[in-house]
Amino acid sequence: IDQGNLIPEEEESYNHTARVCAINKKDNKLYVSMGQPFNVAGPDKYPLYDQVGIGGMIRFNRFPGKLDREVVAIGIRNSVGHAFNPKDGSLWFTDNQVDGMGDETPPGELNKACSLSSKTWYGHPYYGGGNVRTNEYKDKKIPEKYAKNYCKPQVDMIAHAADLGMSFYSGKMFPKKYKNAIFSAQHGSWNAVKPRGARVMVTYLDKKGNAAKTEPFAEGWMTEDGVYLGRPVDVQTYIDGSL
């Protein structure tokens, strides 16, 4: 892809650019998450962002030929992990939320796509995470085109833990309750007064394929004094069933 065809050159940034790629086995296309280059952008940016998929997700045909870019999600701040549920093909993704609102707010998110559409909106910039309104947009009415297509998060994670990579457990080593559960990595905070994160979370799904319960699965990468000994980035199942 030539420069400017993924991200318009005037919008190139070292912040939150193209993040994660994954192939959807249902349509054999490549899905790419596109982070927003701001903590919270001004309203003048969103017509372009929604059009090209910045702060959202796009997909491409994987074969040579015409670039068939499609926007499949908007209103995402900065997703650094997505995967497809092997059982029903649904798209799930993490989302890192707004900074500068305090140590305990807003929550990070684990989302399930309500549909793969350029109209499906996941809350940003009017929501900073979960149902918490951003300071910049809290007094602004949510446009109807967003409100009627709003897809709420499945899970609110603790604020500023930096939820990154995620995957569905496909191995046989772990007990049955973990089959097809979502494991997700919390990289850990960068500007919170009290550091948090640095652990692996697990989210169990119910019979309808929605989030039922989320809890820590593995911890120990941070000392009692808040010093990081390790910072998980992603979680993948190895061929023997280990993580």
Predicted feature locations:
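A conserved catalytic-loop motif detector
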Residues: 33
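Beta-strand-turn-beta hairpins that frame and shape the catalytic cleft
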Residues: 25-27, 64
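Beta-propeller domain segments
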Residues: 18, 36-66, 70, 76-78, ...
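Asp-box/WD-like beta-propeller blade repeats and closely related beta-sheet repeat scaffolds
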Residues: 1-25
